[in-house]
């Protein structure tokens, strides 16, 4: 056996494989890998260690393992970096989410705190006012007591004076009778007076002391009470500040600093600065003085030493001179002794020459040595002293340097301290400024609160007055009704008697005599008042008399002056008129009442001169001298009915004479604009009714002494409708009235606009004109505010386009039209025919279907797709709903097989950051990410591949949708980009429409819908690549859009779902039920399914628009998106799970 193995080894060169050994690798009909070398027989096949980061390679041999680690090191590093970026992005998103929640909580807490501070401020003010009032009352009481005490003291003094003066008088009388008088009694009186004065003074002092004590005690009590109240208030404020500090940043502290604290801080800052400066200056002075003294002392000591050295040098020089002199004198003596002068001396001794020479030499050497020694000593001393002086000078220099360094250090310390103090002072100043601003805000809030309270009080008083007036009016109405009933009975009796006597009516016949006579007979007749002599003369004539050629009926009525405005000549035409007014008004408003009236003829004003009737308005230059060309002659013939509008007695004071004429003039100007509008040949012509002012001269004048005024106009028969209001609100769906308002604004060069259009069909009355300056045209002229209201709410229609107004059908291209788009002034397109067809034919809110029953069925989770512990941001179907694609927060997307129990087929690393949106068409899968890119993927022969990366956005790409021709993407850069799928290039970018981040897109047939943080939904045409319309209504970010049939469903961060009718772009209803942001919604049959961040899924019945079913905890975290699959609902959530829901019987 051993030999056989050796033979195999010798032949093959490969050792045999031990089948029983655990380290052997079985060969299942295949050859062994050539990469397995004999050097690594124990290597076990494994996956790459960077599998956690996304590397999917499987390694068989050690060499392959080493080569893979070397070659793919950069790839592995890139994967690790992407994983880190992804985790960082998750962290930042979570932080952003938490910061948003914290901001919301802060706003709520700030509102609570503001309300609390407002209530506290009001309570504090009331308490302070009460305390001040009590103090004032107490002070008044004290003053009254003082006055009473003073009066009592004065009365006591007067009484005492009287009592003391009576004995004096008696003493004087008795003294006068005697001889001489007695002065002792006067002295006693004077002493008693002085004592009484002293006693009074003492009593006054004691009273003043008591009063002072009482005042001090009262003031102390008041101060203590005020301190307690202020202490309680301070404690409450501190508590509130503590609560706010726990919830709010230090930047947003709501604390009020008093002026005294500011003054104290300022004084403390200044005293600190002054004290520090003084101390530093004193230290510097002391140190400089000490250094100068030391330096001066050292210099003086050096000078003394130098003087000593100089004296020593002088002494040595003098000694040397002496020695030299001695040596010279000794030499001279020796020379005299040795010389031969020839003068012998008897007393001289004989000295040999050798002895003298030796003596001379000894003396010279000794002297020289001594001199040298002295010089050496001097030099040594000089050197030592020089060294000492140098060392001392160096020490002095060192000390000077040390002092300089110390001074510099002190200066630096002082500067640092000054800087710190400056910073502290600046902080205190900033705090004071903040406190001042907060105090101002508090004061403003208190003022507003006080104003609000005053207004409420005024309103309450007005309400009480109105209630009283209403009660009085009701009483008067009851009385008037009783009187009217009595008058009607009397009139009926008289009419019956007249009918029995003479069957012919006194009213002259006209083309509509039967109708008019029946109405007049059925209606209660008016009582004729006293008329002027001229009218009585006219009425006394037979049958029908004439006034300047115009026939006026002889029937009982009242006369009036008729005023008609001609807008062409801009003047008033003055006429006379006879009319008959019913007693009861047939309609009434807030200020005016309307009466049915019959015309009895119109004539000239020759019998009524201007001086007797008109006083102030209109002026003479505004009155036309010609009165023939007028409308009253034709429209107010004898027997015609019209409406008379008269102000109520309560509103007479508010209505001036000019107001009547302004109203009529305004209607005539609008009538002229109606004629201009009709000249443009609109689909329907319009007309404003004629209107006149009438002075009822037969009636008693008003309280201001002027005749009673009223306005009249023809009677409208039919349903009265209001098309738009004075504030620009559109009240009906009719196009002609709105187009007329737009027409007047454009053709007047934006100098006026006609609104408040109302009437029967296209016969209008009571309009209102707004002008930029707000002048003229009555009290309803709102100026620029009224014009802006119309501009922001008006939606142009086909009539606007037919009249070639300032709009363009099919989109807007110019800058002015872009502004109109943003403001809402654009053409309302008809998009229903080219929306995506739908099998759902339900009418939203129709309430035509039977009530849905959920007692026998539940929406249950029938399957949960494998979770990968990453949030699911988007899901989409691919390949005719055979595959489900899901985009995850780690930058990958996974493909699941629908028919194989939702098995995960592919996991693809798509982006460095999370995949926010995924979309599919028949050929491609599109993914978008916060890395500002869009990637295009294909699935072929069991493999996935990224074929293109679209780069163009400068912000996070939030959403993508696609059809077979174009891809649409929206981003945080506030743009929507259009990509051509044949070339994968950008062909269009919509900019400047959305003003904030764009969050979502929805595609239906030809049209694209977009929404975002600016709370507006825009409609786009994908063929003309232009914007058509916008819809406003949400109060927060628009998060998702879903289009079904002719309806658009939008969800928002404001926790609601809005349903829009795309036929007129109006909001049908708002569904409220979720308590957090609604992230997605879909429609299946008659039900709307909505998912929210409150973890719930709700079911809404579109027939009744009610929530009929709720799954409160559908996921552990918020629901991100919903989709419909056959009869099932698929939901994806932030917890990483994907669930399939289905209705099942219980």
Curated annotation (Swiss-Prot):
InterPro entries referenced in this protein's UniProt entry, alphabetically: a-kinase_dom (IPR004166), Alpha-type_PK (IPR051852), G-protein_beta_WD-40_rep (IPR020472), Kinase-like_dom_sf (IPR011009), WD40/YVTN_repeat-like_dom_sf (IPR015943), WD40_repeat_CS (IPR019775), WD40_repeat_dom_sf (IPR036322), WD40_rpt (IPR001680)
Enzyme class: transferase
Modification note: The N-terminus is blocked.
A biological process term (GO) from this entry: chemotaxis
Domain Alpha-type protein kinase: 564-808
Coiled coil residues, start to end: 100-120, 187-241, 297-502
Keyword Nucleotide-binding tagged: yes
Family to which the UniProt record says this protein belongs: Belongs to the protein kinase superfamily. Alpha-type protein kinase family. ALPK subfamily.
Biological role: Catalyzes its autophosphorylation, which is needed for enzymatic activity and phosphorylates myosin II heavy chain at a threonine in the C-terminal tail region. This phosphorylation is critical for regulating the assembly and disassembly of myosin II filament, affecting myosin localization during an array of cellular contractile events, including cytokinesis and capping of cell surface receptors as well as chemotactic cell locomotion.
Protein name (Swiss-Prot/TrEMBL): Myosin heavy chain kinase A
Gene name tied to this protein: mhkA
């Amino acid at each position: 056996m051993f030999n056989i193995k050796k033979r195999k080894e010798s032949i093959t060169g490969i050792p045999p494989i031990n089948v029983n050994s655990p380290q052997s690798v079985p060969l299942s009909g295949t050859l062994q890998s050539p990469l397995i070398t004999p050097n690594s027989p124990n290597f076990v096949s494994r996956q790459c260690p960077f599998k956690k980061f996304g590397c999917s390679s499987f390694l068989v041999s050690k060499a392959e393992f080493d080569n893979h680690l070397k070659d793919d090191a950069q790839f592995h590093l890139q994967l690790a970096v992407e994983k880190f970026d992804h985790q960082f992005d998750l962290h930042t998103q979570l932080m952003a989410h938490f910061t948003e929640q914290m901001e919301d909580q802060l706003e709520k807490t700030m509102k609570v705190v503001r309300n609390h501070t407002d209530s506290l401020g009001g309570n504090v003010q009331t308490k302070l006012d009460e305390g001040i009032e009590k103090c004032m009352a107490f002070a008044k009481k004290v003053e009254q007591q003082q006055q009473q005490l003073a009066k009592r003291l004065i009365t006591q003094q007067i009484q005492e004076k009287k009592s003391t003066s009576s004995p004096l008088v008696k003493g004087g009388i008795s003294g006068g009778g005697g001889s001489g008088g007695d002065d002792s009694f006067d002295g006693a009186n004077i002493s008693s007076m002085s004592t009484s004065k002293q006693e009074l003074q003492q009593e006054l002092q004691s009273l003043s002391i008591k009063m002072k004590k009482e005042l001090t005690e009262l003031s102390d009590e008041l101060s203590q009470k005020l301190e307690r109240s202020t202490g309680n208030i301070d404690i409450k404020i501190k508590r509130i500040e503590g609560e706010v500090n726990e919830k709010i940043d230090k930047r947003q502290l709501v604390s009020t600093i008093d002026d005294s604290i500011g003054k104290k801080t300022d004084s403390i800052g200044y005293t600190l600065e002054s004290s520090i400066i003084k101390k530093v200056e004193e230290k510097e002075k002391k140190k400089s003085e000490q250094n100068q003294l030391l330096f001066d002392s050292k210099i003086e000591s050096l000078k003394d030493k130098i003087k000593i050295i100089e004296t020593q040098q002088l002494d040595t020089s003098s000694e040397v001179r002496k020695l030299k002199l001695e040596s010279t004198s000794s030499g001279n003596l020796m020379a005299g002794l040795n010389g031969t002068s020839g003068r012998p001396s008897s007393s001289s001794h004989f000295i040999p020459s050798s002895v003298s020479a030796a003596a001379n030499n000894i003396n010279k050497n000794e002297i020289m040595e001594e001199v040298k020694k002295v010089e050496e000593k001097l030099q040594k001393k000089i050197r030592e002293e020089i060294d000492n002086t140098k060392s001392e000078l160096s020490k002095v220099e060192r000390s000077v340097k040390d002092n300089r360094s110390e001074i510099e250090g002190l200066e630096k310390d002082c500067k640092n301290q000054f800087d710190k103090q400056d910073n502290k002072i600046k902080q205190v100043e900033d705090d004071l400024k903040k406190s001042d601003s907060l105090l101002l805000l508090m004061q403003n809030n208190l003022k507003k609160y006080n104003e609000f309270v005053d207004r409420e009080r005024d309103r309450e008083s007005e309400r009480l007055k109105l209630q009283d007036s209403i009660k009085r009016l009701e009483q008067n109405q009851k009385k008037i009704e009783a009187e009217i009933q009595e008058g009607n009975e009397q009139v009926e009796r008289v009419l019956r008697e007249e009918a029995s006597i003479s069957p012919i009516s006194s009213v002259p016949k006209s083309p509509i005599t039967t109708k008019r006579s029946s109405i007049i007979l059925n209606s209660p007749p008016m009582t004729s008042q006293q008329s002027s002599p001229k009218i009585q003369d006219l009425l006394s004539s037979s049958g029908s008399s004439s006034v300047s050629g115009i026939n006026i009926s002889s029937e009982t009525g009242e006369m009036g002056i008729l005023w008609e405005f001609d807008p062409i000549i801009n003047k008033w035409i003055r006429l006379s008129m006879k009319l008959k007014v019913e007693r009861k008004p047939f309609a009434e408003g807030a200020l005016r009442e309307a009466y049915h009236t019959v015309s009895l003829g119109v004539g000239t004003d020759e019998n009524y001169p201007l001086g007797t009737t008109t006083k102030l308005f209109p002026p003479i230059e505004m009155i036309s001298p010609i009165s023939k060309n007028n409308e009253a002659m034709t429209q107010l013939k004898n027997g015609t009915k019209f409406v008379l509008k008269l102000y109520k007695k309560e509103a007479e004071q508010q209505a001036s004479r000019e107001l009547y004429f302004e109203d009529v003039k305004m209607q005539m100007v609008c009538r002229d604009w109606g004629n201009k509008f009709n000249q443009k040949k609109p689909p329907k012509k319009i007309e404003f009714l004629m209107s006149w002012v009438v002075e009822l001269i037969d009636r008693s004048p008003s309280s201001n002494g002027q005749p009673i005024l009223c306005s009249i106009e023809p009677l409208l028969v039919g349903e009265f409708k209001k098309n738009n209001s004075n504030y620009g609100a559109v009240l009906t769906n009719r196009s002609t009235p709105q187009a007329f308002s737009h027409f007047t604004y454009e053709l007047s060069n934006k100098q006026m606009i006609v609104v408040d259009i109302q009437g029967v069909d296209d016969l209008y009355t009571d309009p209102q004109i707004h002008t930029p300056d707000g002048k003229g045209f009555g009290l309803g002229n709102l100026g620029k505010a009224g014009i802006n209201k119309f501009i922001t709410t008006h939606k142009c229609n086909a009539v606007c386009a037919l009249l070639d107004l300032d709009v363009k059908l099919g989109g807007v291209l110019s800058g002015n039209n872009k502004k109109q788009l943003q403001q809402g002034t654009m053409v309302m397109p008809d998009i229903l025919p080219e929306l995506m067809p739908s099998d759902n034919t339900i009418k939203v809110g129709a309430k035509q279907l039977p009530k849905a029953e959920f007692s026998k069925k539940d929406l249950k989770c029938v399957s949960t797709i494998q979770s990968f512990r990453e949030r699911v941001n988007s899901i989409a179907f691919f390949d005719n709903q055979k595959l489900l694609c899901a985009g995850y927060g780690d930058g990958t997307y996974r493909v699941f097989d629908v028919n194989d129990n939702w098995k995960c087929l592919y996991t693809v690393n798509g982006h460095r950051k999370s995949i926010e949106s995924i979309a599919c068409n028949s050929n491609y899968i599109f993914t978008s990410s916060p890395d500002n890119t869009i990637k295009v993927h294909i699935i072929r022969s069991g493999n996935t591949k990224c074929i293109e990366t679209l780069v163009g956005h400068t912000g996070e790409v939030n959403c993508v949708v696609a059809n077979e021709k174009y891809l649409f993407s929206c981003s945080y850069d506030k743009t929507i980009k259009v990509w051509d799928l044949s070339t994968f290039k950008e062909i269009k970018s919509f900019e400047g429409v959305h003003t904030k981040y764009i969050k979502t897109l929805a595609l239906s047939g030809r049209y694209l819908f977009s929404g975002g943080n600016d709370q507006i939904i825009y409609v786009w045409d994908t063929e003309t690549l232009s914007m058509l319309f916008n819809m406003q209504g949400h109060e927060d970010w628009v998060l998702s859009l879903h289009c079904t049939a002719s309806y658009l469903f939008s969800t928002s961060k404001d926790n609601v779902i809005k349903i829009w009718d795309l036929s007129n772009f109006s909001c049908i209803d708002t569904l409220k039920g979720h308590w957090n942001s609604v992230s997605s919604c879909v429609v299946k049959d008659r039900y709307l399914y909505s998912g929210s961040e409150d973890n719930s899924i709700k079911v809404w019945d579109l027939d009744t628009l009610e929530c009929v079913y709720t799954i409160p905890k559908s996921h552990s975290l918020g629901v991100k998106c919903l989709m419909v699959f056959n009869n099932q609902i698929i939901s994806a959530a932030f917890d990483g799970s994907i669930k399939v829901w289905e209705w099942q019987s219980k």
